[in-house]
């Protein structure tokens, strides 16, 4: 681990083994938390952890990282593993009847799976003192459907990870989250993007960011104003918070957000950007396009099949948008190679290799770049 990752462990250990780590994307939140688990293993001779993640893709990514630490007894709780219940039953049986406390395991689950009553009850029956709960993208735990379960989660050892732990317009959820992770006064550990790029030992590369401002169409603006007027009725200007978490308000906020997501003038602006880039360079090698979504990404409350929160392409607008942006790239020049890169894609590893060698010059992607 890097020095700042060691510092995170010390802060966590000195905070009764609870903590909320606010770390910039790319600085190694996963490794930082697994280092805490390894330190327990190094001192106690066992590892016991439950890791919660928003999507199925992250379940698999976390498994890969765990194996790099030589953590091998791993159970993935999601629909694509038909044996997970038997594996959990075995762990629970051993926990209950084994006199040896050194049984080691890691259980990786989507939030959607974990929140199901039977799964929630079974996993919470494990060793309360020894299990380390790691919540990836911990802001998901502040969501109303999860926040009401926090009081029933018994694990003494806790780590919350997020580049953005604060939930926008949800001070109640934020307060519950901070209390749960023992970070009511301040984050247990914080490592900002500025420090990661400009600090004494930088770990992230510098980058250029060029905003291109687009305007809403008249129809989009009219719809945006109409929704804003309805939303304003739920807003308390004295406290700068919403007065309710009513489903009607959520739908209004979502509808307004989709107007921005799908703004029609984004496509011609994108066309100008890539055309200029091609004219300047003669190719579009290593171009990664993050297409706006038809639907708001909803990691929580997702099914999982259980949980299809990681699968896109079922929404007509989603298909239309990614197809339009892909066609836009193809129209730049007949020699440009472009592929769609979406969740659930079987050849994604080969596709990434081809992108790295510029066999595929452009990837158009949606949602699977999140988190």
Q: How should each PLM-predicted stretch be described?
A:
Residues 187-283:
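Conserved interdomain linker/interface between the two RecA-like ATPase lobes of SF2 helicase motors
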Residues 136-137:
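Walker B catalytic acidic pair
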Residues 140-204:
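Post-DEXD/H (motif II) to motif III coupling segment of the RecA-like Helicase ATP-binding lobe
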């Amino acid at each position: 681990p890097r020095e700042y990752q060691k510092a995170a462990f010390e802060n966590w250990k000195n905070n009764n083994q609870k903590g909320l780590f606010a770390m910039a994307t790319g600085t190694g939140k996963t490794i930082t938390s697994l280092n805490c688990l390894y330190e327990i293993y190094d001192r106690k001779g066992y590892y016991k952890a439950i890791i919660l993640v928003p999507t199925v893709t992250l379940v698999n990514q976390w498994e890969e990282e765990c194996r790099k630490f030589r953590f091998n007894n791993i159970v993935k709780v999601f629909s694509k593993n038909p044996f997970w219940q038997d594996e959990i039953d075995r762990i629970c049986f051993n926990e209950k009847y084994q006199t040896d406390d050194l049984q080691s395991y890691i259980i990786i689950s989507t939030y959607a799976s974990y929140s199901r009553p039977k799964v929630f009850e079974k996993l919470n029956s494990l060793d309360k003192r020894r299990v380390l709960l790691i919540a990836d993208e911990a802001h998901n735990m502040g969501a109303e459907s999860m926040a009401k379960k926090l009081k029933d989660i018994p694990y003494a050892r806790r780590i919350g990870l997020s580049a953005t732990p604060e939930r926008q317009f949800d001070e109640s959820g934020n307060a519950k989250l901070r209390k749960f992770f023992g970070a009511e006064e301040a984050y247990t550990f914080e490592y900002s993007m500025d420090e990661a790029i400009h600090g004494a030992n930088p770990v992230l590369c510098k980058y250029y960011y060029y905003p291109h401002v687009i305007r809403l169409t008249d129809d989009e603006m009219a719809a945006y104003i109409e929704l804003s007027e309805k939303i304003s009725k739920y807003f308390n200007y004295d406290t700068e918070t919403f007065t309710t978490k009513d489903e009607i308000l959520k739908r209004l906020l979502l509808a307004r957000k989709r107007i921005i997501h799908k703004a029609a003038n984004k496509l011609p602006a994108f066309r100008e950007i890539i055309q200029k880039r091609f004219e300047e360079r003669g190719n579009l090698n290593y171009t990664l396009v993050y297409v706006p979504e038809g639907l708001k990404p909803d990691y929580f409350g997702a099914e999982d099949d259980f949980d299809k929160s990681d699968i896109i392409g079922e929404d007509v607008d989603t298909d239309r948008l990614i197809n339009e942006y892909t066609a836009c790239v193809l129209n730049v020049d007949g020699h440009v190679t472009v592929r769609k890169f979406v969740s659930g894609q079987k050849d994604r590893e080969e596709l990434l290799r081809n992108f790295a060698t510029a066999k595929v010059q452009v990837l158009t992607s949606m949602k699977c770049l999140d988190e």
